[in-house]
Amino acid sequence: MAETSSLISGVAQRYAGSLFELALDANSVASVEKDLGRFEALLSGSKDLRRLISSPVFSSEDQLHAIGAIADKAGIKGLVGNFLRVVAQNRRLFALPGIIAAFRQIAAEHRGEISADVVSAHELTSAQQNELKATLKGVAGKDVTINVTVDPSILGGLIVKMGSRQIDTSLRTKLSSLKLALKEVG
């Protein structure tokens, strides 16, 4: 499993780096990041789309046509639309979530920011996001861009991943720790 994860990470880094260079040359890093965010939202909202990108059952031709149609329907054109088609043609759709995350990280580093992935049990308000950014900026010493994901299974609290650091204040983790402590006592 670690080898597969490493392979995906390597593929994701290479593709994200190439896309970033193209976006930088075209002076469109912000619009590419926005289009990737829209595609990521489609991906997180559709079980069928996730199956399309991860299943080896679909031929590269089927994936190419489907991704092209989805990108066109979502208004994702230009550099990102073409990029998605190339990724589909090369049968690397399975790496798209990693590519998107790697692109965000490269873009943030280019802007002198650090990126943090935040998992919350519910949607964060803009005020909560701003407060979290300010707190993380104090810890990192740099501007922080946050990517928020909602996962109701953590029950409450947050999980923040920033660089090599992870802060887990989720209720699920606290309950698991309490459960282990009670098992040790009894």
From Swiss-Prot:
Major subcellular location class: membrane
Compartment(s) of residence: Cell inner membrane
InterPro entries documented for this protein: ATP_synth_OSCP/delta_N_sf, ATPase_OSCP/d_CS, ATPase_OSCP/dsu
One term of GO molecular function: proton-transporting ATP synthase activity, rotational mechanism
Keywords: ATP synthesis, Cell inner membrane, Cell membrane, CF(1), Hydrogen ion transport, Ion transport, Membrane, Transport
Any one GO CC term of the record: plasma membrane
Membrane topology: Peripheral membrane protein
Alphabetical list of SUPFAM superfamilies matching this protein: N-terminal domain of the delta subunit of the F1F0-ATP synthase
Gene3D superfamilies assigned: N-terminal domain of the delta subunit of the F1F0-ATP synthase
PANTHER family in the cross-refs: ATP SYNTHASE DELTA CHAIN
Entry similarity comment: Belongs to the ATPase delta chain family.
Assembly with partners or alone: F-type ATPases have 2 components, F(1) - the catalytic core - and F(0) - the membrane proton channel. F(1) has five subunits: alpha(3), beta(3), gamma(1), delta(1), epsilon(1). F(0) has three main subunits: a(1), b(2) and c(10-14). The alpha and beta chains form an alternating ring which encloses part of the gamma chain. F(1) is attached to F(0) by a central stalk formed by the gamma and epsilon chains, while a peripheral stalk is formed by the delta and b chains.
Function recorded in the entry: F(1)F(0) ATP synthase produces ATP from ADP in the presence of a proton or sodium gradient. F-type ATPases consist of two structural domains, F(1) containing the extramembraneous catalytic core and F(0) containing the membrane proton channel, linked together by a central stalk and a peripheral stalk. During catalysis, ATP synthesis in the catalytic domain of F(1) is coupled via a rotary mechanism of the central stalk subunits to proton translocation. This protein is part of the stalk that links CF(0) to CF(1). It either transmits conformational changes from CF(0) to CF(1) or is implicated in proton conduction.
Protein name per the record: ATP synthase subunit delta
Native source species: Brucella suis biovar 1 (strain 1330)
UniProt gene name: atpH
